[in-house]
């Protein structure tokens, strides 16, 4: 039950309306930085457990 193309377009349209064209690049940049930090945190968390065993 994944998202179809029409659902994705509706979600993108809602995001565009909420944030506007000027702020959208900044929002996407912040989201990408947050995801990268989360992934790095998950990698660091797994390596700490191996060192302590």
From Swiss-Prot:
Q: Which residues are listed as membrane-spanning?
A: 1-21
Superkingdom of origin = Bacteria
Gene Ontology BP terms = protein transport by the Tat complex
Fetch the Gene3D superfamilies from UniProt.
1.20.5.3310
Under the heading InterPro entries, the entry gives:
TatA/B/E, TatA/E
Bilayer topology annotation: Single-pass membrane protein
User: Could you tell me where this protein is found in the cell?
Assistant: Cell inner membrane
- Disulfide bridge positions per record: none
- Output a single Gene Ontology CC term carried by this record: TAT protein transport complex
> Which family, according to the similarity comment?
Belongs to the TatA/E family.
Q: Could you tell me which NCBIfam families the record lists for this protein?
A: PRK01470.1, tatAE
* Function as written in the Swiss-Prot or TrEMBL entry: Part of the twin-arginine translocation (Tat) system that transports large folded proteins containing a characteristic twin-arginine motif in their signal peptide across membranes. TatA could form the protein-conducting channel of the Tat system.
UniProt-listed HAMAP family: TatA_E
Q: What is this protein called?
A: Sec-independent protein translocase protein TatA
**Organism listed in the record:** Rickettsia conorii (strain ATCC VR-613 / Malish 7)
